[in-house]
Structures are given as C-alpha cells and as structure tokens.
A protein has these predicted regions:
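Flexible loop/turn segments at secondary-structure boundaries
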Residues: 120, 141, 254-256, 281, ...
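Conserved PLP-enzyme active-site core in the AAT-like
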Residues: 8-239
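PLP-dependent amino-acid enzyme catalytic core
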Residues: 1-5
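Short, well-structured beta-strand/strand-turn elements
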Residues: 7-11, 244-247
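Conserved C-terminal alpha-helix-loop-beta "cap" of PLP-dependent enzymes
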Residues: 223, 231, 237-238, 242-332, ...
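Short, acidic Gly/Pro/Ser/Thr-rich loop/turn segments
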Residues: 158-159, 219, 279-282, 313-314, ...
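PLP-dependent enzyme catalytic core of the Aspartate aminotransferase-like
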Residues: 30, 41, 48-49, 57-58, ...
Length: 357
C-alpha cells in the first residue's frame, strides 16, 4: 500500500485471485465490466468465461481505443473498468488518465493491473486510477520463489454515489456493518478483506508472504537493472536485420513511447516483445538455441527467460482474440533479467545466428 500510495492492501494467493476479488468486491450477477482486450490470457478468460458464467457481462475494448469508443462501451449496469498499465505480452501502454476519466464520468472505479511496471516505475493512483492489482509472483518477488497477488485501494473513490449499496447499506453477514461509514476511505479494501477473503479463502501462505517481503527489499535496485538491460537489448534487436519487428516502449520508434514517457518516465519494465524474420518456425529455433536464457512460462524474473505466448499463455484464445490482444503468431516475449548485459546479448546473438541460417 505504501509503495502504491494507497490506504490499504490485501495480499492474495495469486495474481488471478487478486483480479477476481478486485472485481467481485463491487460486481455481482447482473453487472457489467469494461475491460481492455490486451490483457494476460488468464485474465481475458476470467472475464470472457468465468465471470460470464457467474452472470457478469464484459465488453472488451482495444487499449488503443479513442475516448468516444471507450465511452460507448459503458452500460447502465457497468460496475468498473479494468486494464493493464503495460499489457502482457503486447506491451501496449494504456492511457491511464483516459480510462480513469471515462470510468469516473460513468460513476464507476478504474481498476488497473500494475504488475509489469511495478510502483517503482508507475504509480497509477497519481493518474486517477482507483484500485491497483498485482501478481506479486512477478517483479515484486523477483526470484520466482513464491506465488501471490495483491489488491491496493487508493481510498479516493466515492462509494456514496448511489451505485454501490454494498458499501452504504448494512452487511447482514457481518453484524450489519456499513463499510463506507465504519471504514471511510478504506471501505473498499476492508470489504474485500472482511467479506471476500472470508468466503473465498484465497489468502497468501505465510512462507509466500515472507519471500515476498524479502524480494521487495531489492525491488528498486532490480527494476533499475531490468530496465537498463532491456533498453540495451531492445536497441540491439531494433538494428539487427534478422529481426522483423521490436516492441519496447523505451524505444523512440515505439508507438507507445510518448505515453511511456508520460506514465513511466524512469523506465517501463524488463519485458520486450519481438518477431524474427521467418515467423513462428524461426521463433521456435531461436528459443531452442538459447543457452543462458530459459524457455519458461514465467516472466519478470531476475533471470532472463523467453516464451512464445500464442502457444502457451494465450493458447486457449481464438485467432481473432489473439489478434485483439496483440499476440501475433511470431511474437516472442523476452523477459530480460539482471545478468551482465553483454552475456545476455551474446546469447541472443548466437541464437539468432542459428535460427536464421
């Protein structure tokens, strides 16, 4: 909570648990959510399938949508807006102020997953966002030794606007407590703890909480190295003729560079997405040829790792859904670690050589 500048936080058993509880805390059967289409594959299916089966509808919008297109997605029963600060794995920088302003114009909160930038590089509350979620399994831990998530409440949203009776009317399951009256600015996070955590039980294991605290002690140092290493790798890839395209918001050539400088002026994250000439087959050869980097589904680790999202993290999505999420068949997600940058570059160079022979 202190890192994000919020009034309170709740640590959960996973990032997915945090996302689900963040939404269910204010949304129930008959409700509606507006969600960016460029989100983690598990998050997409949470909104597309699981919440739908619970009676909660979702309208997906492009993270590149205009203000008018975003506003058109709202309904009378919309309860919140959800997006990722920096999308996984397409690395689109979401216009936080536009999403937050649209949410507030319709009387609902804006929820943002801030996993990739971390509060070291971006503090969404400063741009109008109301609730932040994290998969603490990623950079906050940084060592891939624990599984967890977190919800952080800014304390800025007015729950007394008439749209959220669950905060202004007595909760009969908790001695008639009225969250907005009893907890004030911390009403949202208090309800998540007293109501949802009680009923769902997705709390963090004690050892995972210990490892998370340990990892966060070096968060600022690690993020600085992740970002500087990733910038060097991205600049190399951009100049290599064997590479078809590179997307990293830190590059001036990125269509999201301007937004990145607005919301993350000191760095974005250590993740790069790119494609090799030769498409999916070349991508497979490249990953198989890496020696230092590991081919794993994990991301945001202090060790360099690589992944093909279309066949792993996003494999359950249709071709059309993959396109909407910005996941092309040739996309390689490179999570740059904190090793010596020359060692990482040498590994990439030799793998490119083998992949494009």
């Amino acid at each position: 909570a202190a890192l994000e500048g919020g009034v309170g936080a709740l640590v959960t058993s996973s990032g997915q648990a945090a996302t689900m509880m963040a939404v269910l805390n204010i949304c129930h059967a008959g409700g509606h959510v507006v969600c960016s289409s460029a989100v983690y594959g598990g998050t997409f299916n949470l909104f597309y399938k699981t919440l739908h089966e619970m009676g909660i509808d979702c309208t997906f919008v492009s993270p590149n949508c205009t203000e008018d297109e975003l506003n058109a997605a709202f309904r009378e029963n919309t309860r919140c807006v959800f997006a990722e600060t920096l999308t996984n794995p397409s690395l689109v920088v979401t216009d936080l102020e536009m999403f937050a302003n649209a949410a507030h114009a319709h009387g609902v909160p804006c929820i943002v997953d801030n996993t990739f930038p971390t509060p070291i590089n971006c503090r969404p509350f400063e741009f109008g966002v109301d609730i932040v979620t994290h998969s603490t399994t990623k950079y906050l831990d940084g060592h891939a030794v624990q599984l967890g998530g977190a919800i952080v409440d800014s304390g800025n949203f007015d729950w007394n606007n008439g749209k959220f009776p669950e905060f202004t009317e007595p909760d009969e399951s908790y001695h008639g407590i009225v969250y907005a009256e009893h907890f004030g600015k911390a009403a949202y996070i208090a309800k998540a703890r007293c109501h949802l955590m009680r009923d769902i039980g997705a709390q963090a294991a004690p050892m995972n909480a210990f490892y998370l605290n340990l990892g966060m002690e070096t968060l600022a140092l690690r993020m600085e190295r992740h970002c500087s290493n990733a910038q060097k790798i991205a600049e190399f890839l951009e100049q290599d003729d064997r590479v078809a395209w590179v997307n990293y918001p830190g590059l001036e050539s990125s269509p999201y560079h301007e937004l990145a400088m607005k919301y993350m002026p000191h760095g974005t994250c250590g993740v790069i997405s790119f494609g090799i000439k030769g498409g999916r087959e070349a991508a497979t050869r490249f990953m198989d040829s890496l020696e230092l980097a590991s081919v794993v589904t994990h991301v945001a680790d202090l060790r360099t790792c690589v992944l093909h999202p279309a066949s792993t993290t996003h494999r359950q999505m249709t071709d059309e859904q993959l396109k909407e999420a910005g996941v092309s068949p040739d996309l390689i997600r490179l999570s740059v670690g904190i090793e010596n940058p020359e060692d990482i570059l040498d590994d990439i160079k030799q793998a490119l050589e083998k992949a494009t022979k």
